[in-house]
């Protein structure tokens, strides 16, 4: 059975069939799902999903795109929600310079990234990192915090080079692998997956985004994760069953969701 470590079932893309889709997960080989907040508006939606579905867990945090909207009250709410039994991580948090080119924007993102990492450290929770076009700054901040003592975490939708992957792996962190690994042109990620130990990989969708082949361009869901597991298996010369088993154990260990 598969654990999806990063999903967004609160997204409006699921408004028409959320209930039916989630109720089909077990028969589709999906055992557990972590619904990850990205905005303040998603906090209560994630809580509702956690409370309604026994197999849905949560991660609470603010995506870097919304860093400029964060206040002290936002951070207090993240801390409060992190105390819930099924809230298993702080995320998704990090840096995204793709649309944010100005140094002032970078400074705001870094400040809020650090503030949320502080919560993860103080509450002894793992983190889920979003990083886009911000490889060096993300790595430097994460390294600083890991040296200061952190529970661990996942680099979500890992997209950088094998060399950067090696730095995260040396820190004991996990790489989140999703649909992109099935794309023909994803040479850099395929090299990273071949290099990284299976013991430091977890499966994720980022749904409704990043659907794997053969469903690329369509709405993604956790039911597509067997395609991701198969792609990883082929790159590593092992079975998809081994990928599913080991990544499930990795997620259970990091996120504390043994049952």
Name these PLM-found stretches.
Residues 1-259:
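Mid-domain alpha/beta scaffold segments of enzyme catalytic cores
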């Amino acid at each position: 059975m598969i654990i999806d470590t990063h999903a967004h079932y609160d997204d409006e893309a699921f408004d028409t069939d959320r209930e039916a889709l989630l109720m089909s997960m077990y028969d589709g080989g999906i055992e557990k799902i972590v619904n990850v907040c990205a905005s303040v508006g998603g906090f209560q939606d994630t809580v509702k999903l956690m409370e309604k579905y026994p197999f849905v867990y949560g991660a609470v945090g603010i995506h870097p795109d919304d860093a400029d909207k964060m206040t002290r009250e936002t951070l207090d709410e993240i801390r409060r929600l992190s105390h819930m039994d099924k809230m298993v991580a702080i995320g998704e948090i990090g840096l995204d310079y793709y649309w944010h080119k100005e140094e002032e924007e970078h400074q705001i993102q870094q400040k809020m990234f650090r503030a949320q990492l502080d919560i993860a450290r103080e509450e002894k929770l793992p983190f889920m990192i979003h990083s886009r076009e911000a490889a060096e700054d993300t790595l430097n901040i994460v390294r600083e915090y890991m040296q200061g003592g952190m529970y661990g975490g996942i680099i979500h939708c890992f997209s950088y080079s094998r060399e950067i992957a090696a730095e995260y792996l040396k820190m004991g962190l996990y790489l989140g692998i999703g649909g992109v690994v099935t794309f023909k042109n994803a040479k850099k990620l395929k090299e990273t997956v071949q290099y990284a130990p299976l013991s430091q990989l977890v499966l994720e969708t980022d749904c409704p985004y990043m659907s794997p082949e053969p469903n690329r361009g369509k709405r993604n869901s956790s039911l597509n994760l067997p395609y991701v597991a198969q792609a990883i298996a082929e790159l590593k010369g092992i079975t998809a069953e081994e990928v599913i088993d080991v990544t499930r154990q990795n997620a259970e260990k990091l996120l504390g969701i043994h049952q």
